[in-house]
């Protein structure tokens, strides 16, 4: 029996997403009997090798679910990795006596993790999507003399100094006054009571995550808060956010892992912490 889980490289999609998908699709599915045997070994004996086999056999389902969230401008590899986190949480909590297959139980946890990732990052992506908007995003703060809205003279002066149209300055200023909406409860909470009903995270076909975020958006903060928050991050965290969400070609977790010589999981943690700090400063 194995009680220390060995690294599972298949959980982290690399630069070649097609190869990853091919790899996980080649892993055999478990029969009901095999699944129950493994589930009992994990549930009653804490056999982590059984957990590893259960996770590997269900990675293909994460890929399938992640594809349905491809319309938010987020890297597919990142959606898959977040879904894999949800899968591992589901395996950890799966009780073989529940009378359902693991895939039926895990789908809620997979979607929960993906939903949290989308709601954590979607607005940051949408704030600056064009080259001009990205330029404004990082420079508008330094161009402003006060916290109130820019007047027409200031708008034209900023536009001229940055080489953009006045309307783009107004548009970016408007975007930066919004705040991000937190998702509650957090998908990584350890409190079992927060997950008494995983169905709470099921998709509501009347509203997708982006629509929920837009409906909950409000405009009572200053653009200065966002820029000051960015300036308050350490250089690496700031670079990760810029490369992931504001660069012309968004970097993947794998790209940044190679750049900083750390694991993709470490980059994901740094990104999550940076986002959390950014929100905390904005909402303070």
UniProtKB/Swiss-Prot annotation:
Q: Name one GO cellular component term.
A: cytoplasm
Q: How does it assemble?
A: Interacts with the RNA polymerase core enzyme.
Q: Which organism is it from?
A: Pseudomonas aeruginosa (strain ATCC 15692 / DSM 22644 / CIP 104116 / JCM 14847 / LMG 12228 / 1C / PRS 101 / PAO1)
- For this entry, list what GO says about its biological process: DNA-templated transcription initiation; response to heat
Tell me the lineage of the source organism. Answer: Bacteria, Pseudomonadati, Pseudomonadota, Gammaproteobacteria, Pseudomonadales
What PANTHER family does the record point to?
RNA POLYMERASE SIGMA FACTOR RPOH (PTHR30376:SF3), SIGMA FACTOR RPOH HEAT SHOCK RELATED (PTHR30376)
Q: Which UniProt keywords apply?
A: Cytoplasm, DNA-binding, Sigma factor, Stress response, Transcription, Transcription regulation
UniProt subcellular location: Cytoplasm
Gene3D superfamilies of this UniProt entry?
Answer: 1.20.120.1810, Winged helix-like DNA-binding domain superfamily/Winged helix DNA-binding domain (1.10.10.10)
Q: Key word DNA-binding present in the record?
A: yes
DNA-binding feature ranges: 253-272
Question: HAMAP family attached here?
Answer: Sigma70_RpoH (MF_00961)
| InterPro entries membership | RNA_pol_sigma-70_dom, RNA_pol_sigma70, RNA_pol_sigma70_r1_2, RNA_pol_sigma70_r2, RNA_pol_sigma70_r4, RNA_pol_sigma_r2, RNA_pol_sigma_r3/r4-like, RNA_pol_sigma_RpoH_proteobac
Protein role: Sigma factors are initiation factors that promote the attachment of RNA polymerase to specific initiation sites and are then released. This sigma factor is involved in regulation of expression of heat shock genes.
* MF terms (GO), sorted A to Z: DNA binding; sigma factor activity
Position of sequence motif Interaction with polymerase core subunit RpoC:
78-81
The identity of this protein, by name, is RNA polymerase sigma factor RpoH
The entry's family comment says:
Belongs to the sigma-70 factor family. RpoH subfamily.
Region annotation Sigma-70 factor domain-4: where it falls in the sequence: 229-280
């Amino acid at each position: 029996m194995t009680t220390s889980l060995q690294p599972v490289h298949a959980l982290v999609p690399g630069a070649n997403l097609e190869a990853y998908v091919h790899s996980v699709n080649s892993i055999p599915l478990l029969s009901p009997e095999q699944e129950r045997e493994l589930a009992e070994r994990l549930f009653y004996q804490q056999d982590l090798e059984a957990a590893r086999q259960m996770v590997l056999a269900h990675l293909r389902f994460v890929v399938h679910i992640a594809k349905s969230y491809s319309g938010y401008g987020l890297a597919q590899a990142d959606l898959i990795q977040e879904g894999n986190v949800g899968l591992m949480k589901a395996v950890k909590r799966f009780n073989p006596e529940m009378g359902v297959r693991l895939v039926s139980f895990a789908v809620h946890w997979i979607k929960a993790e993906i939903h949290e990732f989308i709601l954590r990052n979607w607005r940051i992506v949408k704030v600056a999507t064009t080259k001009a908007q990205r330029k404004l995003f990082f420079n508008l703060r330094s161009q402003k003399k006060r916290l109130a809205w820019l007047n027409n003279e200031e708008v034209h002066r900023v536009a001229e100094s940055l080489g953009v149209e006045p309307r783009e300055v107004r548009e970016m200023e408007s975007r930066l006054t919004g705040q991000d909406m937190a998702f509650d409860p957090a998908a990584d909470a350890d409190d079992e009571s927060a997950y008494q009903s995983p169905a709470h995270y099921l998709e509501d076909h009347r509203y997708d995550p982006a629509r929920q975020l837009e409906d909950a958006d409000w405009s009572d903060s200053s653009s200065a808060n966002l820029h000051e928050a960015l300036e308050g991050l350490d250089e690496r965290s700031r670079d990760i956010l810029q490369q992931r969400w504001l660069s012309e070609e968004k970097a993947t977790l794998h790209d940044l892992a190679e750049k900083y010589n750390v694991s993709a999981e470490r980059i994901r943690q740094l990104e999550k912490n940076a986002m959390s700090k950014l929100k905390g400063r904005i909402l303070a």
